[in-house]
Regions:
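Extracytoplasmic
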Residues: 34, 42-44, 51-54, 73, ...
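Extracytoplasmic substrate-binding proteins
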Residues: 39, 46, 136-220
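A short, structured surface patch at a secondary-structure boundary
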Residues: 58-122, 126
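A structural signal for short loop-to-beta-strand junctions that line the ligand-binding cleft
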Residues: 47, 93, 100-113, 150-164
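Structural recognition of the beta-strand scaffold that forms the well-ordered cores
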Residues: 55-59, 79-82, 126-130, 147-151, ...
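Solvent-exposed loop/turn segments at secondary-structure junctions
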Residues: 62-65, 84-87, 126-127, 132-136, ...
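Conserved H-X4-D acyltransferase segment
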Residues: 43-72, 216
Length: 221
C-alpha cells in the first residue's frame, strides 16, 4: 500500500509539473506572439515587424528619412540611410532642426549596392526600400531583415495621395504616432486646397510655367 500511495503521489507531481511547464510554454508563446505584428507593404508583401520599432534603416527612397524624423519629432530611430539622404540632411534644414539624424550610418551603401554585413551591424528592426526594387526586397528578406516596401509610383505620381499612403504605412510601423500622422495628412490637404483656391480664378495666360529641379550639381540636374 505504501508503494501504491508513493507511486500515486509521484504521478500527481509529474502531472502538476507537466501542467506548469505547459502553462509556462503557453505564456512564452503568447508573449512572443504579442511582440510582433503583420503589416502589408506597398508591394503587397506581408511583413512581420516588432510592435515597438526602435531602429529603422532606409535604403533607396531618399525623402523617407526626413518624413520619419518629422513624424516622430526626432531622428533617433533612423539608424541608417542612403548617402544622398544624408547629404540633404547636412545641407538643409533637417540636420539643423533634428541634429540626431546626422548620427545615422551610411557606410552600408555604395551607390545602389548594399553591403549586407554592414547593414547587419546597424541591427535594424525594419529596413525600408523602394517597393519597385523587387530584387532588393528579396535580397533583404533572404538576409533575414524585416523589409518593408514603400512605393513612389503606385498612385500614378499623385503627390498628395502618395504622401498620404506613405504616412499611413509609417503610422503602422510607428503606431504611437498615429494621431500625428493624421494631423500631417490633414495639413497637406489643407495646403493643397488653399493653393488651388488661390489659382482657381486665373486665366490660362496668367498661369506661370515652373521648372522644378529635384537634384542639381555643376554637372548634372
Amino acid at each position: 500500500q505504501g508503494r501504491s500511495e508513493s507511486s500515486g503521489a509521484g504521478q500527481e507531481q509529474a502531472r502538476e509539473a507537466d501542467s506548469g511547464k505547459g502553462q509556462d510554454e503557453g505564456q512564452e508563446a503568447s508573449k512572443g506572439a504579442s511582440d510582433t505584428k503583420i503589416i502589408t507593404d506597398h508591394a503587397g508583401n506581408q511583413v512581420e515587424i516588432p510592435n515597438q520599432v526602435n531602429r529603422v534603416v532606409v535604403t533607396d527612397i531618399f525623402p523617407i528619412p526626413s518624413i520619419i524624423t518629422v513624424l516622430l519629432g526626432s531622428g533617433e530611430k533612423v539608424v541608417g540611410m542612403n548617402p544622398a539622404s544624408m547629404s540633404a540632411a547636412r545641407t538643409g534644414l533637417l540636420g539643423e532642426l533634428f541634429p540626431d539624424i546626422l548620427n545615422a550610418g551610411t557606410d552600408f551603401m555604395n551607390g545602389s549596392d548594399i553591403n549586407m554585413e554592414e547593414l547587419m551591424k546597424l541591427e535594424p528592426d525594419v529596413v525600408i526600400y523602394s517597393a519597385g526594387s523587387k530584387e532588393l526586397g528579396e535580397a533583404l528578406r533572404a538576409a533575414g531583415f524585416a523589409a518593408v516596401g514603400i512605393s513612389v509610383n503606385k498612385w500614378d505620381y499623385d503627390s498628395i495621395e502618395t504622401y498620404d499612403q506613405w504616412i499611413a504605412l509609417l503610422s503602422e510601423i510607428f503606431p504611437e504616432k498615429e494621431d500625428t500622422a493624421e494631423r500631417v495628412s490633414q495639413y497637406s490637404h489643407k495646403v493643397y486646397e488653399d493653393i488651388q483656391g488661390r489659382v482657381a480664378g486665373l486665366r490660362e495666360e496668367e498661369r506661370k510655367s515652373i521648372l522644378f529641379l529635384f537634384n542639381y550639381s555643376d554637372t548634372t540636374w
